[in-house]
């Protein structure tokens, strides 16, 4: 897979021109109730500080209002005593709630400043800008990207100075440092899938003075084929990069090209004339009188919320079939994902043993059984002529092919069963061609070398392990390349072909013979 699969211009243009004529479902901002506003933004820090300050004020008021009876004795006159009424905080206890009130008020102002700064950092726009931005996101070309970072850890040491009991001493510290060795990036190539925008129509924003919007990017698939194409490319990319180092960090996401995406946004109906509860003067005036929390609750209650999903649909015009003829049935692709759960097939693919020998290898092979080789018949492979397999391939061009894990020239292929039951036999080489096409007349292609100047002895001849006497000419090399091919169909495979199901360990593999 290439480091980055470029998106063709035609697929990018489809985002602009492939829009449905049917009106989209409108999506309007929602004004929440008071309870939901408190659950969304409770401002519990401001509420807690306000309650503590109110408690200090109540304590100070109680000290000023409440009177208690005191009894005092005169030290000079041991007999006389004095009874009077005084405040319970007259002996300096009043300074305790005052100190707490001052401390809490300072923390309260700091929290108000933090809330004000957070509000100022929000992206504020008007309604026209919101509509324009939504249109740009709808028309933007999506890009689903993957990133793989291969890395390992190395052991390093450093000298650290420590202090104990006033004495400095140096020690060696061992730590591990991450080292990135390879970074690879790729994109989802959806040229054969097509993409269009399917979000709802934004409406009703002008009915609220303040609207908080949240934008989320997402994508979906219109059919299973497009999803399998995505999963196949994704699995192939991470599989190619997972063994480059000890560890691999995988990242993935989607972004919209040529669009500055903002997740959170605040829209005002009239930015020049803000409502009184949204102005800066009202905020700090309420904060000075410790009424910031009620003002925030009122602001949240009068604010509408909208969660808008920018969704891209892949595969709405996916061409799952390619008819070779209007009168011929056609087949579907079987994706890589559908066979990745098969442990044995996955092992054959990973082992990279599914190779067809070249023409030179076939010519130079040792003929150990020349005397037992006889006529090749096209009926041995279920074809009705010399070019039967090529004709079959033309009828089912788009069928998924999994090449045999054991070559027809391998040693395992020499042990072809001459069984009378034309079933597919499985053993250590269960995907070999000889077993796939094993029948009463099992055929093995072999090559014997001869002189190029000898007209009576061809340079390449093939025999069959049958009892016929006249050996016909072998098929063309291009047709012979297709012999060790195992054709696996999905349930909705070729309609006109005869399928033979093979069951083993609860799995079913359909082959066209």
From Swiss-Prot:
GO CC annotation, single: membrane
UniProt KW Ion transport keyword: no
UniProt KW Glycoprotein keyword: yes
Glycosylation sites: 366, 418, 505
Spans annotated as Disordered: 1-29
One Pfam family recorded for the sequence: TMEM151
Superkingdom of the organism of origin: Eukaryota
Regions crossing the membrane: 46-66, 93-113, 274-294
Membrane topology type: Multi-pass membrane protein
UniProt feature, compositional bias: Basic and acidic residues: 14-28
Keywords for this protein: Glycoprotein, Membrane, Transmembrane, Transmembrane helix
Family: Belongs to the TMEM151 family.
Localization per Swiss-Prot or TrEMBL: Membrane
InterPro entries membership: Tmem151 (IPR026767)
Name this protein carries in UniProt: Transmembrane protein 151B
């Amino acid at each position: 897979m290439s480091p980055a699969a470029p998106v063709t211009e035609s697929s990018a243009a489809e985002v602009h021109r492939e829009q449905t004529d049917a009106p989209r479902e409108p999506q309007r901002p929602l004004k929440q109730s008071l309870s939901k506003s408190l659950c969304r933004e409770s401002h519990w820090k401001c509420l807690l500080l306000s309650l503590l300050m109110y408690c200090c004020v109540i304590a100070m008021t109680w000290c000023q209002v409440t009177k208690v009876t005191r009894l005092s004795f005169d030290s000079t006159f041991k007999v006389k005593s004095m009874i009077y009424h005084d405040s319970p905080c007259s002996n300096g206890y009043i300074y305790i709630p005052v100190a707490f009130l001052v401390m809490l008020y300072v923390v309260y102002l700091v929290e108000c400043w933090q809330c004000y700064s957070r509000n100022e950092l929000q992206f504020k726009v008007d309604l026209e800008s919101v509509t324009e931005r939504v249109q740009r996101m709808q028309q933007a070309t999506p890009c689903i990207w993957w990133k793989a970072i291969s890395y390992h850890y190395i052991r390093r040491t450093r000298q650290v100075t420590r202090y104990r009991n006033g004495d400095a001493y140096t020690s060696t510290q061992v730590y591990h440092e991450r080292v990135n060795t390879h970074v690879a990036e790729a994109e989802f190539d959806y040229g054969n899938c097509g993409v269009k925008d399917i979000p709802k129509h934004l409406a009703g924003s002008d009915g609220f003075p303040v609207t908080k919007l949240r934008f989320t990017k997402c994508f979906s698939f219109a059919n299973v084929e497009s999803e399998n194409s995505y999963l196949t490319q994704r699995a192939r990319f991470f599989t190619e990069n997972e063994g480059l180092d000890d560890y691999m960090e995988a990242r993935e996401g989607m972004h919209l090209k040529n669009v500055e995406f903002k997740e959170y946004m605040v829209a005002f109906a009239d930015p020049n004339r803000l409502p009184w509860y949204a102005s800066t003067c009202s905020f700090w005036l309420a904060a000075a009188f410790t009424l910031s929390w009620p003002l925030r609750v009122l602001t949240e209650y009068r604010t509408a919320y909208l969660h808008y999903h920018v969704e891209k649909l892949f595969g709405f015009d996916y061409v799952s079939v390619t008819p070779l003829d209007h009168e011929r049935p056609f087949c579907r692709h079987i994706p890589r994902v559908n066979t990745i759960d098969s442990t044995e097939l996955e092992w054959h693919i990973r082992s990279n043993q599914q190779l067809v020998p070249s023409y030179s290898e076939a010519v130079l092979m040792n003929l150990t059984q020349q005397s037992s080789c006889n006529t090749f018949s096209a009926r041995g492979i279920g074809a009705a002529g010399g070019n039967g397999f090529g004709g079959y391939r033309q009828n089912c061009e788009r069928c998924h092919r999994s090449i045999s894990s054991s070559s027809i020239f391998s040693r395992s292929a020499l042990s072809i069963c001459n069984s009378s039951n034309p079933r597919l036999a499985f053993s250590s080489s269960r995907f070999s061609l000889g077993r796939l096409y094993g029948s009463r007349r099992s055929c093995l292609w072999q090559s014997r070398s001869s002189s190029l100047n000898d007209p009576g002895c061809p340079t390449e001849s093939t025999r069959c392990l049958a009892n016929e006497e006249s050996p016909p000419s072998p098929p063309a090399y291009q047709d012979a390349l297709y012999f060790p091919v195992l054709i696996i169909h999905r349930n909705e495979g070729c309609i006109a072909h005869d399928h033979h199901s093979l069951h083993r360990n609860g799995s079913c593999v359909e082959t066209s013979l």
